[in-house]
Each structure stands twice: as structure tokens, then as C-alpha cells.
Design a protein with these regions (language model features):
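Arg/Lys-rich, alpha-helical DNA-contact motif
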Residues: 2-8, 22-27, 31-91
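Short glycine/proline-centered loop/turn elements that form peptide/ligand docking sites
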Residues: 6, 12-19
Length: 91
């Protein structure tokens, strides 16, 4: 989705989005002329907004939490691949 649609879906202001991209909390796809965002980016923006607004997490805390979330997703993918390999190997 384009930047304008992302801002609407994520409920963000332009300045907030620019700061979050600068902090690398959001990493949009810049492979085309216009940057684009995914549904995952929207979900991540909602998480950041909730952490900051509802829970009062500061910027350093957001960095730590997002790093841990990214590690968990990476481990999940690794376990899924391992499970596929085990399931497809002859017994």
C-alpha cells in the first residue's frame, strides 16, 4: 500500500511515520519509485502505538521490544522449516 493509505490504516501522522522509519521501527519496501507498506507494517505500527500510548513504553523500550519480536518471528520461521524438513525426511 502507498504511504497515504498506510497513514490512514495505521492512524499515524506524517511526522510520527518519518520518526519511526528513521528509528528503523518500520522498514517500508523502497524497491520501487514510491515506498510501499505491507499489512505487517500496519500491524507493527499498531503495536508501537499501543506500546507507547497504552503502556507508556519509551523509545529505548520500543527498540528492545521490537528486537525481541523480530527474533521470535525469526525463530518461528526456523522451527517451521525444521519441522518441514523432519516431516519430509524418510524414516
Amino acid at each position: 500500500m502507498n504511504r497515504q493509505q498506510f497513514l490512514i490504516d495505521a492512524g499515524l501522522e506524517v511526522q510520527t511515520l518519518e520518526f519511526w522509519i528513521e528509528q528503523q521501527w518500520l522498514v517500508p519496501d523502497e524497491s520501487t519509485q514510491e515506498i510501499s507498506f505491507s499489512d505487517t507494517d500496519v500491524a507493527r505500527a499498531h503495536l508501537i502505538r499501543d506500546l507507547k500510548g497504552d503502556f507508556g513504553v519509551n523509545d529505548e523500550g520500543i527498540d528492545v521490544i521490537l528486537h525481541l519480536v523480530d527474533q521470535l518471528h525469526g525463530l518461528r520461521r526456523a522451527f517451521e522449516e525444521l519441522h518441514k524438513d523432519i516431516a519430509s525426511s524418510p524414516r
